[in-house]
């Protein structure tokens, strides 16, 4: 009975093992099917992407071929255009050369006529200048006479000041006599002085005690200063510590930045490790399954060994059934391995096809690179042809620039002549202003001399008052009065000095402002004239361009005659000639030279006359201002003299 029970228990165990093996085999089959489906979908997607790439590359090749054909057509068309343009440029150059020869002849004629007119104009200008110079000489002589009269007045004032100084010296002598009298009285009052000396000694003792106290307070203050110095040193050390702490904080910030970078790297490493762990977890069940299969095999072998030991027939049949199932499972595994190998072979074939396609793509890319090089060569040829065209245009422009430079030189010569005239007038005015400034400085020096004399008198009065204080203590009230008078005189002297300095500064500032304004106006006028000349040249260039486009000589001739008629009408009426009329009269000269009238004169004389008139007005205003300042100085000096005389 016991043997039967053991056999039944063994059969139950073997049945449980068979059920577990079948379930595991089914799970393995399902997983293998899932893997195969996933790999098939991946391979199909890769093949589709490769096909789409191939189609795109073929389309790009077709587009490149089309663009190459278009470029070839454009190159042919551009070559034809270049040939046509070269022919046209040759024709135009011949025409322009013929026109330039005509223009040069006309310019030579115009230069000769302009030189004649310029000579006449210079003669008339020389006459006008001589008359203006005579008038200026007469005007300057008048001014010199006026300045001489003013200098005589100033000399008279100087004599008055000298007389006042002599009166002050007489007063000083009287004061000396009074001091002698005071000295005689001082001998009589020596006894009073001795008594006062005793009182003074007691006062000196009190003062010495006060001095000791002051010294003690000074020592205390010095100690406080030393404590303050120590505090300053502590503050400096604290500042240094704060700087050191700031440096440490900067280093800490840098360390924090480095920590942040290290944390970022650690996060990247952790993410990588997490990915590897996920892969590991995904692979662990497969390993567990393999280990379970190995355990089952080991258990089967152990059962076989036990059965061999027991020698029971029923156990052998069960073992054979299990072996048959295992053989079936092995066959299935072999079949699956064969399918996997087939799939790997298919993958290798697909990869080889991909490599072939990549090689084909490389070949097509090289072909495209060659096409691009051809295109660049075509572009370089086009650039060369364009450079040739630009050189031809530059040669033509250089010829035109030469003509423009000749015309600009003539205009610059005229402008320089006008500038010289204006600059000479400005230099004369600057010389006059410098002379007036020197005279004003001389007057200020004379006033300073008088002030120095007054200061010397004040010092002598102070010395006398000190002598009186030392000799006669009873005359303290008189000395106090004298000191008050001296202080009042000092204040008045300071006030007069300040007034004189302010007046001198004002005069210098006014003279400097006048010089600056004159120079600034001259510069502005010169800049305006330069701008006008530049605008004229620009207008001339624009009209030259329009003139090139015009080919009808008759119309240009008629316009030229109408322009010159307008100019001569303006001259007849006496109206000022504008810059536009002058430019319009000069511009068509390059086309025709027949029936040319004499060109009008430039407005430089009118500008110079206006400038001289304005400068004369300004000089009159400056002279009036200087006269007013001189009168004010005279009045102030008279007031000071009267004040001093009243005080004395």
Curated annotation (Swiss-Prot):
The keyword Cell cycle applies. Belongs to the CEP63 family. Phosphorylation at Ser-559 by atm and atr promotes its delocalization from the centrosome and impairs its ability to promote centrosome dependent spindle assembly. Keywords: Cell cycle, Cell division, Coiled coil, Cytoplasm, Cytoskeleton, DNA damage, Mitosis, Phosphoprotein. It is found in: Cytoplasm, Cytoskeleton, Microtubule organizing center, Centrosome, Centriole; Cytoplasm, Cytoskeleton, Microtubule organizing center, Centrosome. GO terms for cellular component: centriole; centrosome; cytoplasm; spindle pole. One of its GO terms (biological process) is de novo centriole assembly involved in multi-ciliated epithelial cell differentiation. Residues 19-188, 222-555, 611-644 form a coiled coil. Pfam families: CEP63. This is Centrosomal protein of 63 kDa-B. The lineage of its organism: Eukaryota, Metazoa, Chordata, Craniata, Vertebrata. InterPro entries: Cep63/Deup1_N. Required for normal spindle assembly. Plays a key role in mother-centriole-dependent centriole duplication. Plays a role in DNA damage response. Following DNA damage, such as double-strand breaks (DSBs), is removed from centrosomes; this leads to the inactivation of spindle assembly and delay in mitotic progression. The modification Phosphoserine is found at residue 559.
């Amino acid at each position: 009975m016991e043997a039967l029970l053991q056999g039944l228990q063994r059969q139950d165990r073997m049945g449980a093992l068979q059920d577990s093996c079948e379930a595991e085999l089914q799970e393995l089959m399902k997983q293998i099917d899932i893997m195969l489906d996933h790999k098939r979908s991946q391979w199909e997607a890769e093949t589709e992407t490769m096909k789409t790439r191939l189609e795109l590359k073929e389309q790009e090749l077709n587009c490149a071929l089309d663009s190459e054909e278009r470029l070839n057509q454009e190159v042919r068309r551009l070559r034809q255009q270049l040939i046509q343009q070269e022919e046209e440029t040759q024709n135009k150059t011949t025409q322009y050369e013929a026109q330039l020869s005509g223009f040069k002849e006309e310019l030579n004629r115009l230069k000769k006529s302009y030189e004649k007119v310029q000579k006449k104009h210079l003669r008339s200008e020389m006459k006008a200048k001589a008359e203006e110079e005579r008038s200026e000489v007469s005007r300057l002589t008048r001014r010199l006479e006026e300045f001489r009269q003013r200098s005589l007045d100033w000399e008279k004032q100087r004599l008055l000041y000298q007389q006042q100084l002599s009166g002050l010296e007489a007063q000083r002598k009287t004061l000396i006599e009074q001091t002698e009298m005071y000295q005689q009285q001082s001998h009589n009052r020596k006894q009073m002085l001795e008594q006062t000396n005793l009182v003074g000694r007691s006062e000196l003792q009190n003062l010495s005690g006060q001095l000791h106290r002051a010294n003690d307070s000074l020592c205390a203050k010095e100690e406080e200063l030393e404590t303050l110095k120590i505090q300053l040193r502590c503050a400096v050390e604290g500042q240094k510590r704060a700087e050191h702490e700031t440096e440490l904080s900067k280093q800490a910030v840098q360390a924090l930045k480095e920590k942040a970078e290290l944390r970022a790297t650690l996060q990247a490493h952790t993410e990588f490790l997490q990915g590897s762990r996920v892969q590991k977890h995904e692979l662990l069940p497969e390993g567990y399954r393999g280990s379970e299969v190995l355990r089952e095999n080991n258990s089967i072998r152990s059962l076989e060994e036990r059965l061999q030991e027991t020698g029971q027939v029923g156990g052998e049949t069960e073992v054979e059934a299990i072996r048959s199932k295992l053989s079936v499972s092995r066959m299935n595994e072999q079949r699956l391995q064969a399918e996997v190998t087939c799939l790997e072979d298919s993958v290798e074939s697909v990869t080889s096809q991909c490599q072939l396609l990549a090689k084909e793509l490389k070949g097509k890319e090289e072909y495209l690179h060659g096409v691009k090089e051809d295109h660049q060569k075509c572009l370089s040829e086009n650039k060369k042809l364009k450079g040739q065209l630009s050189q031809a245009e530059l040669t033509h422009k250089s010829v035109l620039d030469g003509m423009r430079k000749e015309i600009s030189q003539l205009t610059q010569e005229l402008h320089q002549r006008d500038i010289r005239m204006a600059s000479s007038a400005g230099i004369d005015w600057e010389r006059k202003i410098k002379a007036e400034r020197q005279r004003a400085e001389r007057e200020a020096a004379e006033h300073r001399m008088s002030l120095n004399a007054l200061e010397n008198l004040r010092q002598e009065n102070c010395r006398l008052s000190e002598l009186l204080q030392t000799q006669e203590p009873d005359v303290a009230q008189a000395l106090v009065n004298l000191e008050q008078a001296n202080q009042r005189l000092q204040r008045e002297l300071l006030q007069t000095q300040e007034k004189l300095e302010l007046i001198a500064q004002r005069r210098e500032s006014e003279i400097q402002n006048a010089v600056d304004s004159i120079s600034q106006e001259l510069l502005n006028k010169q800049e305006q004239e330069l701008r006008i000349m530049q605008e004229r040249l620009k207008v001339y260039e624009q009209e030259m361009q329009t003139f090139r486009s015009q080919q009808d000589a008759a119309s240009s001739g008629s316009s030229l005659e109408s322009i010159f008629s307008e100019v001569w009408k303006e001259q007849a009426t006496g109206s000022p000639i504008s810059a536009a009329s002058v430019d319009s009269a000069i511009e068509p000269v390059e086309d025709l030279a027949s029936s040319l009238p004499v060109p009008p004169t430039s407005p430089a004389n009118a500008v110079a006359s206006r400038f001289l008139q304005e400068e004369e007005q300004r000089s009159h205003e400056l002279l009036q201002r200087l006269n007013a300042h001189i009168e004010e100085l005279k009045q102030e000096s008279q007031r000071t003299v009267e004040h001093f005389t009243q005080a004395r």
